[in-house]
């Protein structure tokens, strides 16, 4: 591990994980002040995030994991454990995705207009219902969404943290990529709560708290693993994190990017993300 025992690296890793989590609060602010989503920008940004995650996962993290494991366990065992860990990471995030309630699934990224339209449709369908019942239901939707996103963000926090321990060349682009994809999640939390309560501060608070599961995930992961952190642990974690990020990219970011813009815009964003990640890694050789 490159300076893994260096406390400065650990502090930087926590800071970057915290910044990625805070992006849900940015999404909340956008929901309050933006009446229309720039869908082309959203499309390119999500494609960019996917490009960063896929490139760094397959080119850097997987290879680093394999080197760590092969160096300790030998070629055959090291390669097998690397591959098993990669698909274990995919399985973990897929299970979390499966058991999150479908209607509050954070993978279904929505624009400001979509969330507001859904709420207006809901109110229209329930005109005869009492206002307090409708508001309570909207409040519940926002809270359940916040909890769903918090659960989903937990392994992402560990992913950001582990990548940050490997150095700035990995950490900064991944932090930016995860932050970009956290912004629409903040919108999904804050809009229903704001419509239910009329309180921007409360809506922002719930959005903010849902994002804090990322640094919490990092803290818990580091606390549990710090005493057994070695080349084997590092290799398994890096490979699993690579699997998590590939799944997020293919299951969430790319489909959503294509949904909100032209197919080619998503691909251009994807390629740009890969180029930025490649240059970032080359600069730190």
Swiss-Prot record:
Residues passing through the membrane, by range: 13-33, 41-61, 80-100, 160-180, 204-224, 228-248, 265-285
Cystine pairs: none
Main location: membrane
Topology term for the membrane: Multi-pass membrane protein
Cellular compartments annotated: Cell membrane
Binding site for Zn(2+): 156, 181, 185
A GO term from the CC aspect: plasma membrane
Pfam family, one: Zip
Keywords: Cell membrane, Ion transport, Iron, Membrane, Metal-binding, Transmembrane, Transmembrane helix, Transport, Zinc, Zinc transport
Molecular function GO labels: metal ion binding; zinc ion transmembrane transporter activity
Functional note: Mediates zinc uptake. May also transport other divalent cations.
Protein family: Belongs to the ZIP transporter (TC 2.A.5) family. ZupT subfamily.
Protein name: Zinc transporter ZupT
Organism: Clostridium perfringens (strain 13 / Type A)
């Amino acid at each position: 591990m490159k300076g893994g025992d260096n406390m400065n690296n650990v502090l930087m890793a926590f800071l970057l994980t915290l910044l990625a989590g805070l992006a849900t609060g940015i999404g909340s602010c956008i929901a309050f002040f933006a009446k229309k989503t720039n869908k082309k920008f959203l499309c390119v940004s999500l494609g960019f995030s996917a490009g960063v995650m896929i490139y760094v996962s397959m080119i850097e993290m997987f290879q680093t994991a394999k080197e760590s494991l092969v160096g300790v366990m030998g070629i055959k065992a090291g390669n097998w454990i690397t591959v098993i860990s990669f698909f274990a990471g995919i399985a973990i995030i897929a299970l979390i995705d499966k058991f999150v309630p479908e209607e509050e699934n954070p993978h279904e990224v929505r624009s400001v207009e979509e969330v507001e339209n859904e709420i207006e449709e809901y109110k229209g369908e329930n005109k005869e219902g009492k206002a307090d019942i409708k508001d309570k239901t909207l409040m519940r939707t926002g809270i359940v969404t916040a909890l769903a996103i918090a659960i989903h963000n937990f392994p992402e926090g560990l992913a950001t943290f582990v990548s940050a321990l490997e150095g700035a060349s990995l950490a900064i682009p991944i932090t930016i990529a995860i932050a970009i994809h956290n912004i629409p999640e903040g919108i999904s939390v804050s809009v229903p709560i704001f419509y239910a309560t009329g309180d921007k501060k409360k809506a922002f608070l719930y959005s903010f708290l849902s994002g804090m599961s990322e640094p919490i995930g990092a803290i818990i992961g580091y606390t549990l693993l710090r005493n057994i952190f070695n080349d084997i642990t590092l290799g398994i974690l890096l490979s699993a994190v690579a699997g998590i990020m590939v799944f997020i990219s293919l299951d969430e970011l790319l489909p959503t990017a294509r949904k909100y813009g032209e197919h080619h815009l998503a691909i251009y964003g994807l390629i740009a993300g890969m180029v930025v990640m490649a240059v970032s890694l080359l600069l730190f050789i």
